[in-house]
Structures are given as structure tokens and as C-alpha cells.
Amino acid sequence: MKHAMVSGGTRGLGEAIVRALLEDGWVVSTFGRHSTAFVEATQAAGHLHFYQADTADPAAVERVIHAMVERAGVPFALINNAGMAREGVLASMPVADIDAVVSTNLSGALYVTRAVVRHMLLERAGGRIVNISSIIGHRGYSGLAVYAATKAALDGMTRALARELGPRSITVNSIAPGYLETEMTHGLSAAQRGQIVRRTPLGRLGRPADVIGVVRFLLSAEASFLTGQSILVDGGISC
């Protein structure tokens, strides 16, 4: 069985990705700040391993990645999914909120990728890295400047790493979802949801399954010549 690591795999889109990989026969390691009922129930089956860690802490990340490799072997796939958003115009956003978003969305992804790539390079077996970005990083949205900055940075990291790791047969791509039916959009008002749906050519919010299909493709042999790309899964809202 191939081993996949998923950051932020305990809820929302991350949980859906973990479920899909388990269905496909992967051994999955995931980590986050807190366990969930899904994690506790699924770990008992033996193919899901959960570790409690804050990805913004580089020392903790190194320890957790080492433990994962010791337990399940060097991963073939890494999905950087951990993320958070804090809304507010930049001029009045507290520094603590800025730091929290940057630490989780960008620094955490850098620390996790750095630790995992070291093992991939030593293994010399190629690999796949998928960064979960956002349409917010491609288009400007008022009140989300910090979140947009971190997601755009993930896309930049994707392109640079694709060049660094391509000679070692490790592909690096990002997926930029639009608005999805997850807990991150549950706080939207009916008016806000209606506005998003009206602006989306396909006439609905996205579903985790829409993203999972792209994840599965990027991890497959059919995607072995695809790297350095950001794939928008947004129902056409960016057209």
C-alpha cells in the first residue's frame, strides 16, 4: 500500500480527502491540532494514523513527520490542506490574526513540505505533492487580503518546487477550489450564498467530491507529466 500524508485531514475538505484515499487503498497519516470523532473511529481500522501537531511549529513538524515515516514508511504523496481564514480589512486586522493565518496557511505548508521532501529525496522513488490553494488567491476579495496572500504564495511555492523536484520525479501541483459546501462556508448568509451562486456559471457551490476527483487524478500515473500547475475547481466563477 502507498502512504499519503494529509495535513488538516480531520474535518471539512481534508476529512473528505482522507476518506477518499482510504477508499482507494492508501495508508493515510494526518495531523492537526485536535482529533475528531471521525479520526477516532477510523483509526481503529488500522490504515489511518493521526498525530496531534501544530504545523506552525517547525520542531513539532519534524518530530511528527519522523514518527509517521517510522510507522508507515516514506510517503509517496503529500497533500497540504491545513488552512484557516480570518476575515477583515487589512487596515484594521489585528497583528495576531495576520500571524495566525500566515503561520497556518503558508509557514506550516513550508515546514511540512520541507520535512517530507527530505524523506522523499532519500527514498529516490518519486512522489506527488498537492497544495490546496484557493480561488481567493487568484481573484481579489475585499476582507480577505491576508488569506489571499497566503494562498497566492502557495501557488508560487508550487511552481518553484516543481522546478526543484522535477529532476527527482516528484510532481508538485496546486488545486484552487472555489466556494465549497464545507464548514468554511456555513457562516455565509443566504444573501451571500445566493450572490456566489449567481456569479458561478455552473449555478451552485462546489462540493468536496469536485475537488477529490482532481486530487485522485494528480496522484495517479496518468498525471506523471503534469507539474507546476494550479488547477481551478470553481464552477467557472473565475471566467
Regions found by a protein language model. Give the residues of each.
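Alpha-helical segment proximal to the catalytic Tyr-Lys
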Residues: R118, R163-P167, S224
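Active-site loop immediately N-terminal to the catalytic Tyr-X3-Lys motif
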Residues: A91, R139-A145, P167-R168, G203, ...
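C-terminal substrate-recognition "lid" of short-chain dehydrogenase/reductases
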Residues: L110, I170, R204-V233, S238
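Active-site helix of classical SDR
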Residues: T113, T150, T158
